[in-house]
A protein has these predicted regions:
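N-terminal pre-domain segments of enzymes
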Residues: 2-43
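Forkhead-associated
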Residues: 41, 46-116
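A short, sequence-level motif marking secondary-structure junctions
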Residues: 67-69, 107, 130-133, 209-216, ...
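Mid-length scaffold segments of soluble, non-membrane domains
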Residues: 69, 75-80, 189-232
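Short, isolated positions in well-ordered beta-strands
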Residues: 100-102, 125-127, 203-207
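Surface-exposed beta-loop interaction hotspot
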Residues: 119-188
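Intrinsically disordered, low-complexity Ser/Thr/Gly-rich stretches
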Residues: 209-211, 218-227, 233-244, 253-257, ...
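Extended, aromatic/histidine-rich regions of cofactor-dependent oxidoreductases associated
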Residues: 228, 249-251, 255-295
Length: 295
């Protein structure tokens, strides 16, 4: 290893710890927020080409609770990547913002930049997509879930500046497409511009960095470390890292390693760490796993 390795910018520990606590509180709020709150997710169905009826009739392809849905709420039509919703006569389906759906309507997925959120009783719904795959799902959440009030974040390791480390960004000559297995058995493809190299436990370690979109202002890290055999989620954790500066340096704060969505809901499409991101290191920082992960 070379000798030149800058230290992270110094921080005042009390301020650092307070910022971390605020980050934890904001994370808890996001997890129970309608539209995006993983804890509220109660259904996920992959949408096949053609017609998919949904409602409370147990013989339908997508079955919803009868307290929220009539026997047939509507039919989802998929043609390629285009999705249309045909409501049944008198269906209580609404656009989430309040307009009733009375005729066949195009639905934008949550990767289209024009997401259509639906409401049916206490349920919210939208079409969900993942990067690098043409698979689409109907995602359903319960806005009246008692978990909005009762949910608590899992414990985390004590916050420590020791796990705030400088990393060198090593870009590839050209960005690469890297496929990640997901918990459903499928594959998700992300763009990776390069790798982050950091030092811990007297050695250098590498993590493949991912950009979730061309507009990303941070790297998305999907990682595993040896604490997964003891305290943290067995399948790995996620982490957001600021983009490298003009000198190709950034700071990784492992205190903010967090559980993937599949820890809190079985109705997810979580990407799993690739072999390149399995660290031979115990990262004793960040979120631990709950007593009973959902997946």
């Amino acid at each position: 290893m070379g000798e030149e390795w800058p230290a992270p910018e110094p921080v005042v520990f009390t301020e650092f710890a307070q910022e971390h606590q605020e980050w934890r509180e904001n994370r808890r709020e996001r997890l129970v927020r309608p539209f995006s709150g993983t804890v509220l997710w109660v259904g996920l169905w992959e949408l096949a080409q053609g017609a998919t009826p949904f409602g409370s009739d147990p013989d339908l392809a997508i079955v919803l609770p009868e307290e929220d849905s009539p026997p047939l709420a509507g039919i989802i039509h998929r043609s390629g990547q285009d999705i249309r919703l045909e409501p049944s006569a008198g269906s209580p389906l609404m656009i989430r913002e309040g307009e009733p759906i009375t005729e066949t309507t195009e639905l934008g997925s949550d990767r289209s930049g024009n997401t259509t959120n639906l409401a049916l009783g206490s349920l919210g719904m939208r079409v969900h997509g993942e990067p690098g795959t043409d698979r689409l799902w109907l995602r359903v959440w319960d806005e009246d879930s008692e978990k909005r009030e009762s949910f608590k974040l899992p414990e985390s390791y004590p916050v420590s500046t020791d796990w705030r480390v400088t990393a060198r960004f090593e870009p590839y000559e050209e960005p690469r497409a890297l496929s990640f297995q997901d918990v459903t058995g499928g594959m998700i493809q992300y763009q990776t511009p390069g790798e982050l190299v950091f030092r811990a436990d007297g050695r250098e370690h590498r993590l493949v960095a991912v950009l979730q979109s061309p507009r990303s202002r941070s790297y998305f890290m999907i990682m595993w470390d040896s604490t997964a055999t003891v305290d943290t989620y067995q399948a790995g954790r996620y982490l957001s890292v600021p983009l490298a500066d003009s000198g190709d340096w950034t700071t990784i704060d492992f205190n903010r390693a967090y559980n993937p969505p599949c820890v809190f809901s079985a109705f997810t499409v979580c990407a799993l760490p690739p072999p390149e991101n399995r660290l031979q290191l115990a990262v004793t920082a960040g979120e631990k796993r709950p007593d009973e992960p959902a997946y």
